[in-house]
Each structure stands twice: as C-alpha cells, then as structure tokens.
Amino acid sequence: MVTIKAVFDNDTATNLILDGDGLDGFANGAKLDLLRAWWAFTQGTAAANTGDCKIDFVGASSDVTALFLSGTGHYDGSAGAIKAAATNTTATSSDIKGTTRGTSGFVILEFRKDEAYA
C-alpha cells in the first residue's frame, strides 16, 4: 500500500503528487491502482477559480483521469479499485499528478502496487 496526502493553498497548477519510481520495488512499467480517496476543497479568491482537483495517472503520450474532485467527499473503494490505465513503460509509469484551478484543501490517496513491483 502507498498512501499520500497532497495539500493545496489557493493553487492553480499541475503538480506531481507522487513520483512512482522512488517507491521500493519500482520497475519501469509498474502501475499503481487507486483504492480509496478522501478530499476537502474550497474555491480560491479569483473569479475564474473553480476549487476542483483532477487526479491523473501519468501516461507516455497522454494522461488518464482517475478522479475529478470538488467539495468534500470520499471514495471508499467498494466499487473496486480504479485501475491505472495510462499507457507507459518508462520511469514515469507510476507517477500521479493533480491539476488544480484556484483550489485550497487536501486529498489523501491510497494506492496498491501492481504485480510489476518487485
């Protein structure tokens, strides 16, 4: 299991929130499946701010959205894990990024390593 917490303070950016090749047992092409998530977000102060956060699995040519979050909530995993569907066989194959638009708050993400991890 891998659990991370990302905190945002009136942030409008794309942030790498998990650098997967730094995890124990990483091998190129290894993936992380999203098991559970908890979040609480509010909108920033600028008029164009939305107060949301998009969580992506980083892909080789395009990223794949895992969750699009706003407000307060949780995903308890009872519907099953959200599989890492990004096509990637390089050192970024387990990377996770978050994109925010005028967002303050946090997200806690719990992942499971796939069988490619040693």
Task: List the model feature ranges, each with a label.
Residues 63-82:
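An anionic, turn-rich surface loop/hairpin at beta-sheet edges
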Residues 1-26:
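Solvent-exposed, flexible loop/coil segments flanking beta-strands in beta-rich domains
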